[in-house]
Amino acid sequence: MTFQKSTVVPAAEGRVKIDKDDNGNYSVNVKVNNLAKPSRLQPERKLYVVWMETENNGIKNLGRLKSSSGFFSDDLEGSLSTISPFKAKRVFITAENESNLQYPGSIVVLSTSDFN
C-alpha cells in the first residue's frame, strides 16, 4: 500500500508492506523516498516515528524511521522493518523530537488510507 500525498512534505512518497507470518504476527516494512530532513520542518523536529493504528488495540509506536546512514542525509530515504502482533488498520509517520513516545504528535507527515 502506498502513502497518500503529504501536505507537510509534498515530495515524499513511500510504501508499506505487511505480511502475516506462520506465528500469526505481522511483518511490517516501510520505505520512504524524498522525505525532508526533520530539522527543515516548521516547527523543527529531530526524527520521524512510524505508527500503526490497529483494529482493536489502539495506536502503537513501531519505531524510528532510519536512513541508510543512520541520519537523514542527502539521499532523503528512510525505512523501517519490524514485527507486530497486531493487525494494522493504517500506518502513518509523524515528526517528533523523541522516538520512545506512547502517543503520536500532531505533525503527521505521511499516512496510508485504511486497510481493507
Residue ranges: model-predicted function:
Residues 1-116:
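N-terminal targeting/export leaders
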